Amino acid sequence: KRKNNIAINRNLSEQAKILYKEWFIDFGPFEGEMPGDWHLGTVEEIIELHDSKRKPLSGRQRDDMEKIYPYYGATSIMDYVDNYIFDGIYLLLGEDGSVIDTEGYPILQYVFGKFWPNNHAHVITGEKGFSVEMLYLLFSLTNVQSIVTGAVQLKISQQNLKTVEVVIPSYEAITEFDEMIQPIFREIRRLRTENDKLTTLRDNLLPKLMSGELDVSDLDI
């Protein structure tokens, strides 16, 4: 079930990326040309950064905490902690360490609910009508190799991130497209939530089965 949900979500994400490329890179619905009321701008115009609210926790601090809310690093969940800083839908973009994939695209995490990020990922929401979902698609299709600094420890600074050139559509186009993709991302969130519950159930039941505390030998399966 979990593997199936992961595969479905991967497919849903790819569908959304194809739609974004068709609209905002290939300009398919607009006869292959960028409409006159759109413009080339920079990332600074369309994002809000929440990095100042981040707070890293040491391994020792986390060891003493109850494991409730995800603690995010640059690329993934690193641990679970007993409190949270953010509650909602956000985009995490790797700031240092593993910041790009082998092709130069940024490492992204589409996160929702209550969570605590460390200081290795930028915490982003949208401006000018851009939803987090649209930003996720935009950055998924934007090569950022040229703004990465550092030879040993790679880094995408706030300043450099803000300079990335992007197509900024009209508010009407943004709204219309966002209405198309929101059902896709609602399903992605639903399936991820279902997987989280399945994982919790497995983690709770497995030790009991292994220890013999839970006996299923009499179940008619």
Write out the residue ranges for each language-model feature:
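DNA target-recognition domains and sequence-specific DNA-contacting regions of bacterial/archaeal
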Residues: 34-35, 39-169, 220-221
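Non-catalytic DNA-recognition/assembly elements of restriction-modification systems
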Residues: 1-56, 61-73, 167, 171-216
